Structures are given as C-alpha cells and as structure tokens.
Regions:
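Extreme N-terminal starter segment of soluble prokaryotic enzymes
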Residues: 1-3
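Short glycine/threonine/proline-enriched tight-turn/helix- or strand-capping micro-motif at secondary-structure
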Residues: 15-24, 94
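Generic structural motif
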Residues: 98-100, 129, 135
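Cytochrome P450 core scaffold surrounding the K-helix E-X-X-R motif
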Residues: 45-50
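Glycine-rich beta-strand-centered segment in the early N-terminal region that forms part
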Residues: 26-41, 54-121
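Short polar catalytic/cofactor-binding loops
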Residues: 7-13, 40-42
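A structural motif shared across PLP-dependent enzymes of the aminotransferase-like
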Residues: 121-133
C-alpha cells in the first residue's frame, strides 16, 4: 500500500521545495502500531522544517510527480546556515492523531487496535505512520 507524505528539501539553487511524496506504508514491527492519520497540528517547529529561512513572499505553486508542491526562495545570505539541508528530503510533522489500523504482536500494541491515539515521533504529515507503542 502507498500513501502521501509531506516532505521538504532545500535544493542547491536556493529553492525550498515542500511536496507531497508517495511512500510505502510500513508494516508494524512487534512493538509498533500503524496509525491512519486524522489530524496533525502545525507548530512553529514544523514551519521551520518546512520552509527554513525561505522568503515566504516568494512562494509559488508547482507540481512534483503529479502531486502539488510549493517552491520558495532562500536569500543568499541564509544559504550558508542551511547548507546541511541541501539535497535532503525531510519528512514534516512532529505529532499527530488518528486510528490504529494495524498492530504488531506485542500485547500493548494489540490493545490499541481500532482505538484513536495521539502520538509523537515526527513524519506525521502523512496518510499513515508506524510508531512504537510507547509513542502513543
């Protein structure tokens, strides 16, 4: 099964790209649950990861592999501070909530099957997220 996940990348040309990227939905391990995401807040830390030091007034719509994307320009003076991000696609979303749709074999994971949970652990701007049961 596949799902969409929001990711952000700073390109060498000084453009930040926020895009919906298609990924595989993972199978939960022994102590994990698979959650169908129903809600995820937007926090300042999420905005920092999505846009970095980009100039928000430069935002423009684009498309990546048939999915919507947003492009923003990073001022030249800010590129040095953001250099470690260049070329790295980074999943966005610190926390979220949703319903457990699959569980590993651990009793604590099985006990959450079908329940609505809140969780943290990053990568929450997606259709599904697999997390250790301790993060619920």
């Amino acid at each position: 099964m596949r799902t969409l996940q929001m990711q952000s990348c700073l390109h060498e040309n000084g453009t930040v790209e926020c895009a919906l990227v298609e990924i595989d939905v993972p199978e939960p391990a022994h102590n994990e649950v698979l959650v169908q995401i129903e809600a995820a807040p937007i926090n300042p830390s999420d905005l920092g990861l999505m846009f970095g030091a980009a100039d928000l007034s430069s935002a423009r719509l684009a498309e990546r592999e048939g999915q919507p994307a947003l492009l923003l320009d990073v001022p030249t003076a800010a590129m040095r501070a953001m250099a470690p991000r260049i070329g790295h696609w980074m999943p966005v979303g610190n926390e979220g909530s949703g319903r457990v749709v699959a569980a590993g074999s651990h009793p604590d994971a099985e006990a959450l099957m079908g329940r609505r949970v809140g969780m943290f652990g990053g990568e929450m701007y997606a259709g599904y997220r697999c997390v250790p049961v301790e993060q619920c």
